[in-house]
Design a protein with these regions (language model features):
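Tandem repeat scaffolds
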Residues: 2-242
Length: 242
């Protein structure tokens, strides 16, 4: 990995194009249109910043987001072993990409929201929104966070969801060995699998839910696949949690 890096520490409203082979460090800045040319940007980090990244074909492995607002869009993006933490709000939209061992933890206001409970989350809670299609997301992790996940044809094997409030829409995703612990899913969360003969349905049989609140339709599909349930509360379809 190259040791060269570029530091952006001023507000940039115009397009900024960065060549491959550099670590991009953005600190206390606003970068409205950051274009990363196809190639490697291992170890890039965004600290206390507001950044919009266009990352088609980029390797953003080991990316770090700390106390920032981050928007990342692209196809063929690698974000393996990335970490967004400490109050980072993010919007991620990826296709044909990889988020192996990618982790989100401690979104803004999540600690207070989780303490109050889903019915009293309040308006000061920031969240992470992740949309992914046809992507590898094994060992994906979300902890102590409020998030919205929309994933289609993704591999979420060995993923972990811990102390979260989530809106999830999983379409034909493999949740083999996925663990949901102390998780509340909104009543409009959806789980869809086109056939019982798919790897997604077989994988769901290996998922586990402990101390969770699940909407009825989500629960019924998971239990029909053989997912493990322990201390799970099922909410009716007309009940809004958050």
């Amino acid at each position: 990995m190259t040791s060269q890096h570029i530091i952006l520490n001023s507000h940039q409203r115009d397009k900024v194009v960065v060549r491959p082979g550099l670590q991009v460090h953005v600190e206390s800045s606003v970068v409205s249109h950051l274009v990363m040319a196809r190639g490697s940007f291992h170890g890039s980090r965004f600290v206390n910043s507001d950044v919009h990244v266009y990352a088609d074909g980029c390797d953003l492995s080991n990316i770090r987001g700390v106390s920032s607002q981050i928007d990342i869009r692209g196809e063929g993006v690698i974000m393996d072993s990335g970490l967004f933490r400490s109050g980072t709000v993010a919007n991620i939209e990826l296709t044909n990409s990889s988020m192996f061992d990618f982790e989100v933890r401690d979104t803004p206001g999540s600690s207070l929201a989780l303490h109050r409970g889903a019915n009293d989350a309040g308006g000061d809670v920031g969240s992470v929104s992740i949309s992914a299609a046809n992507s590898s997301c094994e060992m994906f992790k979300i902890e102590r966070s409020v998030a919205e996940l929309s994933m289609a044809d993704c591999d979420l094997t060995d993923s972990t969801f811990y102390r979260c409030m989530l809106v999830v829409k999983f379409a034909n995703c493999n949740l083999k060995n996925a663990e949901f612990v102390d998780v509340t899913l909104s009543q409009d969360s959806m789980l869809s699998i086109p056939s019982r003969s798919t790897a997604a349905f077989r994988g769901l049989s290996k998922a586990s839910f402990v101390d969770c609140v699940l909407p009825r339709r989500f629960y019924e599909l998971a239990i029909s696949a053989g997912a493990s349930m322990d201390h799970v509360e099922v909410i009716p379809e007309d009940m809004e949690l958050f």
